[in-house]
């Protein structure tokens, strides 16, 4: 289980990313066109509003590593839930 403060920090970052995504994309488009003022405006936005600062975390325990995008959970929880038959369409393979 990850620390609650780390999970809360990541939730806050996710909200900031969603809030500023459109404005950030528009500013980046203007910067690519050569507008220097847009670069200054982009620098004024919060650092945590950048998408690269958000970390994928397991929805169940907040684990930041071993994240499986398809299911939104960590490999540890995936193995537990798949073994218990809770995840639909997933079964243990044998050949």
From Swiss-Prot:
Annotated GO biological process: translation
Pfam families: Ribosomal_S14
Highest taxon in the source lineage: Bacteria
Any Gene Ontology CC annotation: cytoplasm
Keywords, comma-separated and alphabetical: Ribonucleoprotein, Ribosomal protein, RNA-binding, rRNA-binding
Subunit structure: Part of the 30S ribosomal subunit. Contacts proteins S3 and S10.
Family in the record: Belongs to the universal ribosomal protein uS14 family.
PANTHER family: 30S RIBOSOMAL PROTEIN S14, SMALL RIBOSOMAL SUBUNIT PROTEIN US14M
Protein name as catalogued: Small ribosomal subunit protein uS14
Taxonomic lineage from the root: Bacteria, Fusobacteriati, Fusobacteriota, Fusobacteriia, Fusobacteriales
Gene name of the encoded protein: rpsN
